[in-house]
Amino acid sequence: GRWGSFIAWLLDRLHHEVTLHGRKNSASMQRWIGERRNDLIELPESVSLSTELSCMENAEVVVISVGAQDLRALMGEIALLSPKNKIFVLCMKGLEMPHGKRLSVVASEFLSSSNRIAVWVGPGHVQEFYRGIPNCMVIDSEDEKTKHFLVDAFSGGIIRFYYGQDMLGNEIGAASKNVVGIAAGFLDGLSLSSLKGALMSRGTHEIAELIGALGGNPFSAYGLCHLGDYEATVFSAYSHNRRFGEAFVRGSPIMSLRRAMRLHALL
């Protein structure tokens, strides 16, 4: 998808050896192979392309960007390769339905203890990054060395990375901002955009309480994983969640919206 190809583009610019993997039956991957571009950017020849998951076997870091509800199936395929001593970075925001499992928990079910898991969350749209507009994001991991290694390895481009201090809170905050984005779209669709300030204020407070109730640090909700992502989610014309809420309020059928915007789950 757009986010995964952006990450490949970004890490290549940081002089890492990058391979972009996609499924054989993926139309977007076939376009990358045929044209080395999508509607936004062209990938240089220095980025390798592969439809074989075995391409990750020699990688030190595996960055994953798929739909939250697709992670379990992908991790099942990865587990068949018996990876060892790798860092898996999850770059999507959501919870696994129907039980609300955090994505790092899902990934951990398939990996041996020799591997490490990190999350990459925070604001940003690829359309703006490609235009050179910078932003700040968070990398978090239960393993301190992994966290510092990734921030050092991924820094130096158009994203300023911060060290996360609460993996549970950062994952819950990032997933929950999707719901606030949809609510913001409702307000836009009802011509009640002036209420977005109240939505952001009350929404952040309630998500802070949720994080605390789940065992995380409530103050994480006020960081880049949630409140810091509101501009990109609540106001931006690129926000899928906001656009979904606005179109739904104006009468578009929910199933057609989900197909058009590739939204498989809202949280």
Locations of the language-model features?
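Internal alpha-helical scaffold of NAD(P)-dependent oxidoreductase catalytic cores
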Residues: 70, 81, 106, 110-116, ...
